[in-house]
Amino acid sequence: MFDDQDEIHPLLAGAPQTTEFRKLRKRIVREVREAIETYGMVERGARWLVCLSGGKDSYTLLAVLHELKWRGLLPVDLLACNLDQGQPGFPATVLPEFLSRMGVPHRIEYQDTYSIVMDKIPQGRTYCALCSRLRRGNLYRIAREEGCSAVVLGHHRDDILETFFMNLFHGGRLATMPPKLVNEDGDLFVYRPLAFVAEADCEKFARDMAYPIIPCDLCGSQEGLQRQQVKQILDGWEARSPGRRQVMFRALMNARPSHLLDPGLFDFLGLATAPRAAEERQDEPPHLRGEA
């Protein structure tokens, strides 16, 4: 796709000059391009709001998108955005300093959603669901203010698999986070270009690049017990059968409504055998007609 000796975007400057890292980088870039092309995420001249939390996944997303744009392979404008939600101990200067140093256009927004969550959620319960909803609403608002057509999130393959099994085990439905959707108001796309990328690859990429990672548990809340349990199940399957995660992920791209049970997806009532004139069967010998 490109020569490793070519000039690269500052976000990838200082990348380890090892064969292992070059393979990792090329794999992630290839998988992001594949997701973008498979789900039709690109509208030439569009503007994307790329959400940056300061975690390994969003750093990986930001770097790869800027690398593609740098090489003329992604014809959109990119605006990085971090929403400072007022969590105690949040290092407010880390991201703006990093983005400025890298020459990345960005917007840092302060909205104290932390206080709202603490007021609404009883002690001992996980804050993640309400926190996520409040964050998403603010990101949609910012996208509109900045003239963006899409909000771009850093969910990867493992997030998508975990959400599928959480819905299966606890929600009684076959559903997950799609790589592309339209928000409820119908005015913004939501994209997940890391949909084909493994979490382990994001973690290694961000670690090797020494990006300034900000922990996601500053509020003191941990991931919900249900997601932790699903992670453990998937980890166990992967340990016993390496490659199992990728097989399961491919299944999400290979649904057969006629082999499921949802009459809303397949017209079982209208199902009929292929028409065959009775006269044609009369020409068959009795033993073929089941009469012998």
Curated annotation (Swiss-Prot):
HAMAP family: TtcA. PANTHER family: AMINOTRAN_5 DOMAIN-CONTAINING PROTEIN, SULFURTRANSFERASE-RELATED. One of its GO terms (molecular function) is sulfurtransferase activity. It comes from Cereibacter sphaeroides (strain ATCC 17029 / ATH 2.4.9) (Rhodobacter sphaeroides). The keyword Transport does not apply. Keywords: 4Fe-4S, ATP-binding, Cytoplasm, Iron, Iron-sulfur, Magnesium, Metal-binding, Nucleotide-binding, RNA-binding, Transferase, tRNA processing, tRNA-binding. This is tRNA-cytidine(32) 2-sulfurtransferase. Belongs to the TtcA family. GO terms for cellular component: cytoplasm. It catalyses: cytidine(32) in tRNA + S-sulfanyl-L-cysteinyl-[cysteine desulfurase] + AH2 + ATP = 2-thiocytidine(32) in tRNA + L-cysteinyl-[cysteine desulfurase] + A + AMP + diphosphate + H(+). Homodimer. Catalyzes the ATP-dependent 2-thiolation of cytidine in position 32 of tRNA, to form 2-thiocytidine (s(2)C32). The sulfur atoms are provided by the cysteine/cysteine desulfurase (IscS) system. Its main location: cytoplasm.
